[in-house]
Regions:
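Surface-exposed loop/turn motifs in large extracellular/passenger domains
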Residues: 61-80, 95-114, 125-146, 151, ...
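Short, flexible, surface-exposed loop segments at domain boundaries
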Residues: 1-58
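Feature marking well-ordered beta-strand scaffolds used for ligand recognition
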Residues: 117-121
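Generic N-terminal leader segments that precede the first folded domain
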Residues: 55, 85-86, 106-108
Length: 359
């Protein structure tokens, strides 16, 4: 979309304002994301939905091409339709070539017994139901359901941006995040209902290359082992939402990345696993996998509640970290081991070199 001039009177309560700063700290662009979800977000600068600066980690060349049931390369609106994908490692809807595509009250399904999942799905969105790589997807109401390895629900990669409002997202298999960014992608969500059931399938998920996620309202549940409510290798802000991990820690932040929570109810129930030194509810760490840049991990929570169903509360290892809490109701489990543990680790998970991987 072309840049337009707007005034303060054009901004309504509930809109999200994104400001990108230049090297001198001056505003280079200002983008207003309207809660109306009409696909007409107005920008006062050169870019719309500019990606954030989550720690990028190791960058790679991406995939040569994608396979999709429907690839949208021009502006269009699809309303009240069913989009089905049953192919191996394919997308149901792929938005590219700078297209602005509105998916309004559609039923989108992705089912495959032969899909592989893995890094191509986590890093680039191969096999996601809805994938925006170069363009903007406006997803309003409707549902997105996947039963395939690597079957993320909504995925923004690279120059892709996803706006989603009132949509139900449910994924079943492994490596299938609910809403997902990587490679600098951008995703904004309002009042979503997200549930994941596989391993490595955070309800709110990011991976190599980082990006920006801003979410307001809704319910986000992960049920799998190794599937937090939020997994951050990006800059992620969530407000007024319920965030629950039934088989994992509630939050995982890796490296130079951040999570900011405002008036959220956050719950974690991490499984006891032999490969871990102990059990926690929020972890800030550096895995050394190359998925995130080394640096300070930031967790901020303002208002709301934090409930630990198993193990300690905050655990940080092999990284610098900043944890800020303000007016948060903290609920401990009966066997709580610690509130905060800053420590090295035995390196069973490959998190740095034992003896020099403290926090």
């Amino acid at each position: 979309a072309e840049a337009e001039e707007i005034s303060l009177s054009d901004i309504q309560e509930g809109d999200i304002v994104s400001i990108t700063l230049d090297e001198d700290g001056n505003a280079a662009s200002i983008t207003v994301m309207s809660m109306e979800m009409d696909g007409q977000g107005q920008s006062g600068g050169d870019e719309q939905g500019a990606p954030g600066q989550g720690g990028p980690g190791g960058q790679s060349q991406g995939v040569d091409s994608y396979t999709a049931v429907n690839e949208y390369i021009e502006d269009t609106t699809i309303s009240n339709e069913t989009i089905e994908s049953t192919g191996t490692d394919e997308n149901a809807a792929l938005i590219s070539s700078g297209a602005n595509v509105t998916l309004d009250n559609d039923t989108i399904t992705r089912t495959s017994a032969d899909s592989q999942g893995g890094d191509n799905s986590s890093f680039y969105g191969v096999g996601a139901a809805v994938l925006a790589t170069d363009g903007t997807a406006y997803v309003k109401d409707g549902s997105v359901t996947t039963d395939a390895a690597g079957g993320a629900g909504l995925f923004a990669y690279g120059d892709g941006t996803v706006y989603a409002s009132g949509t139900t997202v449910k994924t079943t298999q492994d490596t299938s995040g609910g809403v997902h960014v990587a490679g600098g992608g951008t995703l904004y969500g309002w009042d979503l209902d997200v549930e994941t059931n596989g391993e490595s399938s955070a309800a709110i998920r990011s991976d190599r290359g980082g990006g920006t996620m801003v979410i307001d309202g809704g319910n986000y549940v992960s049920n799998g082992v190794g599937s937090p409510a939020i997994y951050s290798t990006a800059d992620i802000a969530v407000s007024n939402a319920s965030l629950t991990a039934n088989g994992s820690e509630a939050v995982c932040i890796e490296g130079l990345n951040s999570i900011h929570l405002y008036d959220c109810d956050l719950t974690g129930n991490m499984s006891d696993l032999d490969q871990n030194d102990n059990t926690w509810t929020v972890i800030l760490y550096q895995s050394m996998s190359g998925d995130s840049e080394v640096g300070n991990s930031t967790f901020q929570m303002d208002g709301g509640s934090l409930t630990s169903e198993n193990g300690g509360v905050f655990y940080t290892t092999n990284t610098e970290s900043t944890i800020t809490l303000n007016n948060v109701d903290i609920n401990y489990n009966d066997d709580n081991e610690f509130f905060l543990q800053c420590t090295g680790n035995t390196n069973q998970r490959g998190w740095g070199q034992s003896g020099v991987n403290g926090a």
